[in-house]
Regions:
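Helix-loop-strand module that forms the ligand-binding subsite of alpha/beta enzymes
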Residues: 113-198
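N-terminal secretory signal peptides and thylakoid transit peptides that target proteins
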Residues: 2-19
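Glycine-rich phosphate/pyrophosphate-binding loop and the adjoining helix
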Residues: 205-232
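N-terminal beta1-alpha1-beta2 submodule of the flavodoxin-like/Rossmannoid cofactor-binding fold
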Residues: 31-143, 155, 225-231
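Short, surface-exposed alpha-helical segments at coil->helix boundaries
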Residues: 83, 87, 91, 158, ...
């Protein structure tokens, strides 16, 4: 399946586990430049002001994302973020299209420490865990399109994203993945969503390097236009 990524950066698609590359892949949506916007955490579910006119049930859009602030990977080092990179990207998308926004929050929050989060993620992946979600949505049946956002941790989306996708019936919907990463691009995200969202069409995803997320608004707009979600 085709994925959309900015042309100016080649993405390593290898399954690196440890060492500098592997630890980067383990927590890839975890870096941001100095000018990354800092803002209060949004409420669990928010509805941005409509920008494209009224929507019927068939074309209503849900943007659901998981993002982790705190100590994050940054060009081989570490950096503390008030706002996680995936949230920065999700806000950028929500400014451009008419959608309802839902932040996926774990019942047991991930540690602020980068290394502790890496270790927890490895345990969850090895156990094929389904971390519980705090305040989950009651239903998504009113939507025809779902944008799913997350970092890439150890070459795939965090296991909490599988908790989310397995909780709902995506039959007949279109799913648009978007991720922030360090070295692994989309990783196995499209394949994983194909497995956990049976009956849905998995559209080409968007992968943005976490350290440079604020620099890619034009790429976000192109991706949304190619997906038919942005027409102006």
């Amino acid at each position: 399946m085709r994925q959309y990524q900015p042309n100016r950066r080649a993405v390593l698609q290898q399954g690196l586990l440890l060492g500098v590359g592997g630890w980067a892949a383990a927590l890839t949506g975890c870096s941001s430049p100095d000018n990354a916007p800092a803002a209060p955490t949004p409420t669990t579910t928010a509805t941005p002001t409509p920008k494209r006119g009224g929507a019927t049930t068939a074309n209503r859009i849900l943007l659901a994302y998981f993002s982790r602030p705190g100590e994050n990977y940054y060009y081989g080092g570490r950096r503390n973020l008030e706002v996680g990179n995936t949230e920065v990207l999700a806000r950028m998308i929500a400014e451009l299209i008419d959608c309802n926004v839902h932040r996926i929050e774990p019942t047991d929050p991930y540690p602020a420490s980068y290394d502790a989060t890496v270790a927890r993620n490895v345990r969850e992946q090895n156990a094929d865990a389904r971390p519980p979600i705090a305040d989950p949505l009651a239903s998504i049946e009113q939507y025809g399109t779902v944008l799913l956002g997350s970092p890439i941790w150890n070459v795939r989306s965090p296991m909490i994203m599988t908790t989310f996708t397995e909780s709902y019936d995506f039959t007949g919907m279109t799913v648009h993945p978007f991720v922030t990463y360090a070295v692994s691009g989309l990783g196995s995200t499209e394949r994983d969503y194909t497995a956990s969202c049976p009956g849905a069409r998995i559209a080409p995803g968007l992968a943005v390097q976490g350290e440079e997320v604020t620099q890619h608004r034009a790429d976000v707009e192109t991706w949304l236009r190619d997906a038919g979600l942005l027409t102006t």
